[in-house]
Regions:
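N-terminal non-globular leader segments, chiefly Sec-dependent signal peptides
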Residues: 1-67
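Short, compact, well-ordered microdomains
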Residues: 56-89
């Protein structure tokens, strides 16, 4: 599971629009589907259960840090930073 910790534009400026702010802090599963990242949000940023999906625009590049496990996904419009979340299961 991963948590969306930050969403920026291509220049690194944090996105402050409502939809982007609502996505930050979500915890869930991420997978590639049709060239996009489909993020199944299982918990909102307050830790309350939710069951929604977030789909990015077309992915141009992504990198996974081998030490921290952080994934950085660069889309046509945004950069998503996702940190691994350890679960008790």
């Amino acid at each position: 599971m991963y948590q969306i910790t930050r969403i920026t534009d291509k220049e690194g400026v944090a996105k402050a629009e409502g939809a982007y702010l609502a996505h930050q802090g979500c915890v869930g599963d991420a997978k590639m589907e049709d060239g996009c990242v489909l993020f199944h949000c299982r918990y909102d940023r307050r830790g309350k259960p939710c069951n929604r999906y977030i789909r990015t625009s077309i992915v141009q590049d992504w990198k996974k840090d081998k030490v921290t496990g952080q994934i950085v996904v660069e889309t046509m419009n945004s950069v998503y930073y996702m940190d691994p979340v350890r679960t008790g299961t």
